[in-house]
Amino acid sequence: MTDASALDFDVVPSTDQSFENALANARDGRRLTVADGIELITTGTDTDGIDPRRKELVLEAADRRRADVVGDDVTFVANLNNNVTTACNTGCLFCNFKDTAHRFETEHEAAHGGFTKTPAESKATVADAIQRGVSEVTSVSGLHPAFGLNEAHRDALDPDDPDHNYKPPEAYDTDPTTYAAQIAAMSEAGAHVHSITPEEAHHAQRGVSWGYDEVYETLADAGLDTVPGTAAEILVDEVRDVICPGKMTTDEWVAAMEAAADAGLGTTATIMYGHVENAAHRIHHLDVIRALQDRTHNITEFVPLSFIHEQTPLYERGVVDGGASDAEDELMIAVSRLFLDNIDHIQSSWVKFGDAKGLALLNCGADDFMGTILSEEITKRAGGQHGEFRSVADYAEMISAIGRTPVERSTDYTTRHVINPDADTIGPHVGPNADGTPLVSERAGTPPHSAGD
């Protein structure tokens, strides 16, 4: 495994006007080079640290680009997170979501705080959310050893072969069954199913000869609608060797995303930054995403995810002592907008940043403000402090307060409903059962049909 201390930043400016030239290219709408991106995200490699004046120039350029590309709408989706299982043996050092899979085995006597849901439980959870007005379910889960693409896949896996990372369902208290069964259950509940990351697709073809195409075609037939481009982290293998040595390579991640596009499934893309990587790694990651979009024209949004370091192995082992600074977060959003000239939507995540900072980032180039999220586990387990739910009324109030227009959207942005922040009742309209009734989290202790979303 690569030592994090070996990830040096050795970029030097090509001229003493490198930052000014990069900023001019950004302002004029020219396609940025990797060198341009590095100049902008560092506010100039000719100086140490982030220059406040230059930073503001980058943020202003990004906000103008946002206004030119998508206008003043701030979008969000009424959605639910339905994570199927926390069982996982991958051992990513940035993650505190998973629980080692052997703890879920029937013979393991010690208690653990994880969970595994059956397809019936997933269906019931999603059906309840759909009835209350949600349109999308996002499902990202641990790589449970009993998971297979379908029953034929599980039959082909050998529990005695360590490369298969497989144990039969009877070894566990709860059988997650298969990806196809879970997707079908959520789809049957009426949701737009946004699921099966490239890493999950990799897990769904382990030990057999079929590729990502067959995985995504099978799951599309089962009811999968779109694919979250998470598990990207940093798409530079020397970084991945430090933070997630058990995960797929950059080339494998890209191949899975291309297969999803070939199967007719829309995708998103992400970056998880603020740990061991440097500024050049961040821009090389954006370059991989931009090249992928040039080929597929399939990515609807890009989501910068700032590393939440508390309670993660990277922090507990002393590999990192914190995450990205506020200025780095602002520049990550801004340069994503400027560099990714072929992706319309850039997301600011209130789960990662909180409401106030998340709103501020909407003035740095972002135009989407994530989703209502009736349940969220991944960031919370890593130490995130910003809650699990925002109502449609919350969105209307926050977005209108910064002078922008709140718009509920579908996952693929094709269906949009402008929210009137002055309406007597404010609720979702896009979902199959949405009728404007206020959407309230079960955790709020308020009946779903009470006033005051």
From Swiss-Prot:
SUPFAM superfamilies: Radical SAM enzymes. Its cofactor is [4Fe-4S] cluster. Pathway: Cofactor biosynthesis; coenzyme F0 biosynthesis. It catalyses: 5-amino-6-(D-ribitylamino)uracil + L-tyrosine + S-adenosyl-L-methionine = 5-amino-5-(4-hydroxybenzyl)-6-(D-ribitylimino)-5,6-dihydrouracil + 2-iminoacetate + 5'-deoxyadenosine + L-methionine + H(+). Binds 1 [4Fe-4S] cluster. The cluster is coordinated with 3 cysteines and an exchangeable S-adenosyl-L-methionine. Its EC number is 2.5.1.147. It comes from the Archaea. Residues 74-344 form the Radical SAM core domain. InterPro entries: Aldolase_TIM, CofH/MnqC-like_C, Elp3/MiaA/NifB-like_rSAM, F420, rSAM. GO terms for molecular function: 4 iron, 4 sulfur cluster binding; 5-amino-6-(D-ribitylamino)uracil--L-tyrosine 4-hydroxyphenyl transferase activity; 7,8-didemethyl-8-hydroxy-5-deazariboflavin synthase activity; metal ion binding. The keyword Disulfide bond does not apply. Residues 418-453 are annotated as: Disordered. [4Fe-4S] cluster binds at C88, C92, C95. Pfam families: CofH_C, Radical_SAM. Gene3D superfamilies: Aldolase class I. Keywords: 4Fe-4S, Iron, Iron-sulfur, Metal-binding, S-adenosyl-L-methionine, Transferase. NCBIfam families: PRK07360.1. PANTHER family: FO SYNTHASE (COFH), LIPOYL SYNTHASE 2. Catalyzes the radical-mediated synthesis of 5-amino-5-(4-hydroxybenzyl)-6-(D-ribitylimino)-5,6-dihydrouracil from 5-amino-6-(D-ribitylamino)uracil and L-tyrosine. Belongs to the radical SAM superfamily. CofH family. Consists of two subunits, CofG and CofH. This is 5-amino-6-(D-ribitylamino)uracil--L-tyrosine 4-hydroxyphenyl transferase. It comes from Halobacterium salinarum (strain ATCC 700922 / JCM 11081 / NRC-1) (Halobacterium halobium).
